[in-house]
Amino acid sequence: MKIVILGTAYPYRGGLATFNERLARQFQAEGHDVEVVTFTLQYPSFLFPGKTQYSNEVAPTDLRIKRWVNSCNPFNWVSVGRKIRKMQPDMLITCYWMAFFAPCYGIIERIVKGNGKTRCLALVHNMIPHEPSLLDKLFAPFYVKSTDGFVALSDSVVKDIDKLDKCRKPKTFSPHPIYDHYGERMSKAEACELLKLDADKDYMLFFGLVRAYKGLDLLLDAMGKMHDKLPNLRLLIAGEFYEQEEGYREQIKNLGLTEKVIIRNEFIPD
C-alpha cells in the first residue's frame, strides 16, 4: 500500500513528530511505501510559547520527509493537495491535534480525494484541545466532513468526534502505544549518576512541557501536604515551561519545598 502521512515531523521536535516518524517506520517495516509530508511553517511565532519549534538532532536517513505545507497559506494548501493527488496514494493519514490545522487539512483532503483513489484517515490525538477555543467549533467540523474515517488514541476522543461527525463515519479507538525507541533500561544508580542526582533519594517525575492544564500546581500542593511524611521524596520537574516559571517557583517557596523540588526547564530530546 502507498501511504502518505501528513503531520509534524523532522525538523520539528516533540512527541507528535516522534509519533509520526515511528508510525512511518512501522508501516515501512510491514512492507508499505511511505512518505511523510510536513510543514515549512507549522505555527506562527505568536502561537508558539516555547523556545524553538525545531529539533537539534540529526535528520533521519531512513524516512522520506517532504517539507511542503505552510499552515497559514491557503494557496499553498491547494498546491500541496494537488501534489499529493498526483502521487496517487492509497491512503492519506492526517495527524490531527488542534483546530488551527483543520482548514489546512480539510482543503488538502478534499483536493486529494479528487483522484478517485485515495482514502483519507484521521489519526486524532485530540479532537477538542486541552485548552479549547472558538476555533474548535468553527473549524473542526470542516475537517471532520472531509475525512473518510477516524482512529482515536483515547476513548474520550472517540466521544468528542461523535459530537462533530453527523454522518457517523467509521471510527475506532486504538490506545496510544508505548514508545519503544528509547534504548535499553538502566539502573537507578546509573541514571542518577548521569543526571547528577542523589541515588539515596526517592524521586517523583513530572515530565514534559509544563502547561496550566497539566496540573503541576496541584501536584505541588499535594507534595506540600505529604512531604513531612515522606522526607526522602524529591520531585523532579523535567520539561520546558510554556507558562511563567516564576509562579511555580513562588508556590514551591511558599510550600516549603525549595530543597525538595528540582527543576530542569528545558526541552528533553529523545
Residues of each region from the PLM?
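Glycosyltransferase donor-sugar binding loop
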Residues: 39-43, 207, 234-247, 266
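Conserved donor-binding/catalytic core segment of Leloir-type glycosyltransferases
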Residues: 198-214, 220-223, 236
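A short, glycine/small-residue-rich beta-strand->loop->alpha-helix junction that serves as a flexible
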Residues: 7-22, 44, 97-102, 214
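N-terminal strand-loop element at the rim of the active site
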Residues: 9-13, 25-86, 157, 162, ...
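Nucleotide-sugar donor phosphate/pyrophosphate-binding loop at the beta->alpha transition
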Residues: 116-121, 127-146, 159, 186-189
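A short helix/loop element that forms part of the nucleotide-sugar donor recognition site in Leloir-type
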Residues: 183-197, 250
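Donor nucleotide-sugar binding/catalytic pocket of nucleotide-sugar-dependent glycosyltransferases
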Residues: 145-186
